[in-house]
């Protein structure tokens, strides 16, 4: 059993999603958003760090996956996003978690089947894959998609290792 924490970073809203991966199946554990307040970026970064640290204490994940920075039209926005990512990554590293990073297109490809999917398509597929009663908020859905992408990647690596080393139905022997 592996618990995966997925993060969709942002300087104003950072989404998080937690899933459990067991025997090739995934189960929803929780999701939400860390909403920062205040004018100073340093205060917002501390709020992100503290929020991620609390989530790590609550869910005790084994793995941490985060979306990479995309090239924004506004360089200032890209810098702030990078700093928000850094704050989240430091929280994970301080908790001893391994960190995996995925491009947004890779996450969408893994969850929806196309790297050009829009937010609504991601929300819908996350709802379907995790058997949720309703679509999660967009930032939380993106974070759950990151966690699902990491889960799919891990399962693929296990299957590939099995072809070399021998596995029983996708699980390491």
UniProtKB/Swiss-Prot annotation:
GO terms for molecular function: crossover junction DNA endonuclease activity; DNA binding; magnesium ion binding. Its cofactor is Mg(2+). InterPro entries: RNaseH-like_sf (IPR012337), RNaseH_sf (IPR036397), X-over_junc_endoDNase_Mg_BS (IPR020563), X-over_junc_endoDNase_RuvC (IPR002176). Its EC number is 3.1.21.10. Homodimer which binds Holliday junction (HJ) DNA. The HJ becomes 2-fold symmetrical on binding to RuvC with unstacked arms; it has a different conformation from HJ DNA in complex with RuvA. In the full resolvosome a probable DNA-RuvA(4)-RuvB(12)-RuvC(2) complex forms which resolves the HJ. The RuvA-RuvB-RuvC complex processes Holliday junction (HJ) DNA during genetic recombination and DNA repair. Endonuclease that resolves HJ intermediates. Cleaves cruciform DNA by making single-stranded nicks across the HJ at symmetrical positions within the homologous arms, yielding a 5'-phosphate and a 3'-hydroxyl group; requires a central core of homology in the junction. The consensus cleavage sequence is 5'-(A/T)TT(C/G)-3'. Cleavage occurs on the 3'-side of the TT dinucleotide at the point of strand exchange. This is Crossover junction endodeoxyribonuclease RuvC. The gene is ruvC.
């Amino acid at each position: 059993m592996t618990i995966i924490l997925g993060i969709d970073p942002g300087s104003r809203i950072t989404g998080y999603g937690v899933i459990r991966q067991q025997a090739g199946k995934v189960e929803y554990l929780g999701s939400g958003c860390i909403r920062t307040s205040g004018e100073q970026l340093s205060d917002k970064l501390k709020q992100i760090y503290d929020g991620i640290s609390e989530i790590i204490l609550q869910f005790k994940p084994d793995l941490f996956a985060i979306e990479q920075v995309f090239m924004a039209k506004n360089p200032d926005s890209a810098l702030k996003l990078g700093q928000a990512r850094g704050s989240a990554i430091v929280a994970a590293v301080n908790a001893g978690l391994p960190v995996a990073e995925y491009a947004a297109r890779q996450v969408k490809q893994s969850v929806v089947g196309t790297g050009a999917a829009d937010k609504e398509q991601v929300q819908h597929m996350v709802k379907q894959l995790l058997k949720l009663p309703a679509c999660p908020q967009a930032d939380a859905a993106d974070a759950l998609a990151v966690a699902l992408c990491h889960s799919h990647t891990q399962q693929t690596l296990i299957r590939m290792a099995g072809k070399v080393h021998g596995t029983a139905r996708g699980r390491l022997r």
